[in-house]
């Protein structure tokens, strides 16, 4: 018969923050993965377990830094577009990618001339190509 022990008992204890960023209103509970849930001041790993992505400057900085050097990969371009980080590529232009036209694209020329660009069919691969530039409304 095999004896199983708890994962938490075999791990070394991690130092906890001595001064929490905010007072805890509940004690919190441990979930199956060993992370503390509930309204707690900090997790055992030292970062906030509660909060949104946009409200956390640490996560936002990490994402901006990790995505800034990878302009040409299509999968990351789609991710950045959905997160709203793709604006710098539209300004600088990146003609090597069909779904991210540069400043000399036909859509922007038609937009400047007062005509709206033609709507293109939407597919899961070419979602970014159906978005109109900001000047077209």
From Swiss-Prot:
Spans through the membrane: none
Region described as Disordered: spans on this chain: 1-137
Ranges annotated as biased composition (Basic and acidic residues): 94-109
Biased composition (Low complexity): 15-27
Pathway in which the depicted protein is active: Secondary metabolite biosynthesis
Polar residues bias locations: 1-12, 51-71
Domain of life: Eukaryota
Reported function: Part of the gene cluster that mediates the biosynthesis of the tetramic acid Sch210972, a potential anti-HIV fungal natural product that contains a decalin core. The PKS module of cghG together with the enoylreductase cghC catalyze the formation of the polyketide unit which is then conjugated to 4-hydroxyl-4-methyl glutamate (HMG) by the condensation domain of the cghG NRPS module. One unique structural feature of Sch210972 is the tetramic acid motif proposed to be derived from the non-proteinogenic amino acid HMG, by a Dieckmann-type condensation catalyzed by the reductase domain of cghG.
Name listed for the protein in its UniProt record: Sch210972 biosynthesis cluster protein E
Naturally occurring in which organism (per UniProt): Chaetomium globosum (strain ATCC 6205 / CBS 148.51 / DSM 1962 / NBRC 6347 / NRRL 1970) (Soil fungus)
């Amino acid at each position: 018969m095999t004896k199983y022990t708890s994962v938490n008992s075999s791990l070394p204890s991690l130092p906890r923050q001595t001064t929490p960023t905010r007072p805890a209103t509940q004690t919190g509970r441990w979930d199956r993965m060993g992370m503390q849930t509930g309204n707690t001041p900090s997790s055992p790993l030292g970062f906030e377990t509660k909060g949104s992505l946009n409200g956390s400057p640490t996560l936002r900085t990490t994402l901006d830094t990790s995505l800034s050097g990878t302009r040409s990969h299509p999968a990351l371009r789609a991710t950045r577009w959905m997160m709203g980080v793709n604006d710098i590529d539209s300004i600088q232009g990146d003609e090597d990618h069909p779904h991210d036209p540069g400043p000399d694209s036909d859509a922007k020329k038609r937009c400047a001339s007062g005509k709206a660009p033609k709507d293109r069919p939407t597919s899961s691969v070419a979602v970014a190509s159906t978005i109109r530039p900001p000047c077209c409304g």
